[in-house]
Amino acid sequence: MARVSENLSEKMKALEVALSSIEKRFGKGAVMPLKAVETVEVETIPTGSISLDIATGVGGIPKGRITEIFGVESSGKTTLALHVIAEAQKRGGVAVFIDAEHALDPKYAKKLGVDVDNLYISQPDYGEQALEIAESLINSGAVDVIVVDSVAALVPKDELEGEMGEAQVGKQARLMSQALRKLKGAVHRSNTALIFINQIREKIGVMFGNPETTPGGRALKFFSDMRLEVRRLGDVKEGGEKKGYRVKVRVVKNKLAPPFQEAEFDVIYGEGICRICDIIDTAANLGVITKSGSWYSYGEKRLGQGREQAKKYLLEHPEMLEEIERKVREVSGLVRPDTENSVGEKSE
């Protein structure tokens, strides 16, 4: 027993010498006991969908982390990202949209609630330029959310300047790998939410297993703290007319909460995510609103027969809608975002 104690004492002395040397070279706090590290709750930006906020387990898109939103074309990826930007701006945050696809529609963004007059946009010519711009903005510490749309459009400069049909094997994957190694630490230090929008492609000749993959290599999958898969389920109709589409978002990777949670919500053409519909559906699933047959009720008050009637009633009674949303957040364990506590304020 005495020998064990003596060995432990010698180890601690050796550790103290090593820590002292490290501190001189790299500064105080380079290595420290875990108990000395202050635990800071991760700040988040709401997604515009309360069901998706719940599915993420932390209340939205995490700041100081990298998030990938991927899916097939026209599934609602950019719409979701624009809602995140709108929510950040409502809370005093600064947002940047790096439009590598050169396809952002300011009129559509405005309809989703984005303050286009205060949205910063970049339309880079090639992939390296886009990622260097993102790095500079992140290092400034002044930006709350950066959206890169999309990874598939981050074409390396060599490929753009090369001949048509010339083989450019793995250049984009190497570009993403090099960039993400630099961006990961910078994102954490600046507390910026970095969102990459990505597409789904199919591998050629895959007979077994999932043939679907995303461009840009494996680096983004590895460095992302959260990955959201967006799927379009079907059309939303009203009186036989198509008004929008139903979306399912699956959290396929989550380093902050249990993964594989799912959320479904409606996206209305020209309006974006139907917030009231989402609140009604989520409240009904959690028992905040009761559904008897086709009737929706909140407490003793009948809201209407069918979701459209309930939606109409809550539009006319916004104070009740606010109360229902608050109860949904309480029941689900989410803290209601306080618009007075700006996400634009950087943590010390």
Curated annotation (Swiss-Prot):
InterPro entries: AAA+_ATPase, DNA_recomb/repair_RecA, DNA_recomb/repair_RecA_CS, P-loop_NTPase, RecA-like_C, RecA-like_N, RecA_ATP-bd, RecA_C_sf. Its main location: cytoplasm. Belongs to the RecA family. This is Protein RecA. It is found in: Cytoplasm. Keywords: ATP-binding, Cytoplasm, DNA damage, DNA recombination, DNA repair, DNA-binding, Nucleotide-binding, SOS response. It comes from Aquifex pyrophilus. One of its GO terms (cellular component) is cytosol. GO terms for biological process: DNA recombination; DNA repair; SOS response. GO terms for molecular function: ATP binding; ATP hydrolysis activity; ATP-dependent DNA damage sensor activity; damaged DNA binding; single-stranded DNA binding. Can catalyze the hydrolysis of ATP in the presence of single-stranded DNA, the ATP-dependent uptake of single-stranded DNA by duplex DNA, and the ATP-dependent hybridization of homologous single-stranded DNAs. It interacts with LexA causing its activation and leading to its autocatalytic cleavage. Coiled coil: none annotated. ATP binds at G71, V72, E73, S74, S75, G76, K77, T78. The gene is recA.
